[in-house]
Amino acid sequence: MFRGASAINLDTKGRIAIPKRYREPLRAEYNGQLVITVDFQSSCLLLYPLDEWSKIEAKLLLLSDTRASERAMKRLLLGYAHECELDGNGRLLLPPPLRQYANLEKHAMLVGQLNKFELWDEAAWQQQIEQSRETIRSEEFASNERLADFSL
């Protein structure tokens, strides 16, 4: 399970170094194999261990190719999907189209989301945090039935 937010940098070749605390679990449980794709709702990337990505692909397989919205989602998620493996130094190479989609240049945030990571441009992450705070303070959040019984 992945949690926490880590500030990371892209090198001149477009590689990121996965924080050390995640490297061994990724290698031990997933052989260091990941799939990187885009988030169709936000300007960030999603990094899934290959086994977790296989579950997503199984769900995508059930979607229609004739319904425009389902086809659009499949196009984005599968079209951008890039399989990769941690190198000996715990780095991943981000292909240029993925870097462009998320506006990644130098400073980024790797954010654990239990079964996956989100990879954000650092400035975009800060904006997202502010938007999330506003959402939490909104009436819509307060009236969400699924969150009514959620407590910390």
Curated annotation (Swiss-Prot):
* GO CC terms in record: cytoplasm; nucleoid
- Keywords associated with the record: Cytoplasm, DNA-binding, Repeat, Transcription, Transcription regulation
Entry-linked PROSITE patterns: SPOVT_ABRB
Q: Where does the UniProt annotation locate this protein?
A: Cytoplasm, Nucleoid
Q: Where is the SpoVT-AbrB domain?
A: 5-52, 81-124
Q: Which CDD domains match?
A: MraZ_C, MraZ_N
MF-aspect GO terms: DNA-binding transcription factor activity; transcription cis-regulatory region binding
* Biological process according to GO: negative regulation of DNA-templated transcription initiation
Q: Which InterPro entries match?
A: MraZ, MraZ_C, MraZ_dom, MraZ_N, MraZ_sf, SpoVT-AbrB_dom, SpoVT-AbrB_sf
The record's annotation in SUPFAM superfamilies points to: AbrB/MazE/MraZ-like
Q: Which family does it belong to?
A: Belongs to the MraZ family.
Q: How does this protein assemble?
A: Forms oligomers.
Would you tell me the protein name for this molecule? Answer: Transcriptional regulator MraZ
Q: Which organism is it from?
A: Shewanella violacea (strain JCM 10179 / CIP 106290 / LMG 19151 / DSS12)
